[in-house]
Amino acid sequence: GRSYLLDPDNGAVIIHGIQHVRPGESTAHKKAFGTRYGSEAQWSEETGKLLAGNHINYISYGSNRIEVFPAAVRGNLLTPKTQKIAYAENLYLLRTFMWDMSKNLGYAFDDDKYNRLVLLFEPTFATYIDRLVQEKSALFAGDRHFIGFYLDNELPFASYQNADPLRGIDLKHFLSLPERYKAAREYAEKFMRDNGIASTGVITKKNQEDFRGMVADYYYQLTTATVRRY
């Protein structure tokens, strides 16, 4: 069974892990990798021993377009020596929608101008991530080492006192969005109406925090429900 992170005496278990356990993709890395290891099989054998020797109990593969560990390295990394290692992956639901916008919607997202969380409210977002989760969940069905997905590693939530609209969730930023992102703008406008806020000039810190909370709740509720569906 999946007894990777359970203590038989019901004690606390600390996940002692590392992310992105895979060869790099830069030219310099590929050259050094070939010289040092020669093959992925040799690299994974040595890396697996290193993981086991340091009592690692969790790793991730970390591909942007989420995928399982390749067969050539899987055994060496997930069952080094006598140890079983668990893994989980980041679904990158928001980013993948953004990456595929040109193909699906005919235009690219201006990531340097707008907070990517505005894409939550695009009319096709929920349908898109439903298909994506269904596709990716099938990859891990029956995998005894796989313990689940995580969702929030991709989110631009952190910005000190909302100082940077592109790194936080800023109500004024949402209200100023162009017609192309009107779904997110209308979400912010409804928030203003529902809370009796007459103009941007009277938005308080509490209003900002309440709006941040609503957007975060919307993301987590939608994505969690979608993942649990499959």
What is the predicted role of each segment?
Residues 1-80, 96-144, 202-204, 209, ...:
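Active-site-adjacent substrate/metal-binding segments within catalytic domains
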Residues 8, 102, 111-120, 138-230:
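Polysaccharide-binding and catalytic clefts of secreted carbohydrate-active enzymes
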Residues 16-17, 62, 88-90, 150-152:
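A cross-family glycoside hydrolase active-site/sugar-binding cleft signature
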Residues 58, 84-88, 144-150:
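Structural preference for beta-strand elements that scaffold enzyme active sites
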Residues 64, 92-96, 152-156:
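Active-site beta-loop-alpha junctions enriched in small/polar residues
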Residues 83-100, 175-182:
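Acidic, His- and aromatic-enriched active-site or binding-groove loops in soluble protein domains
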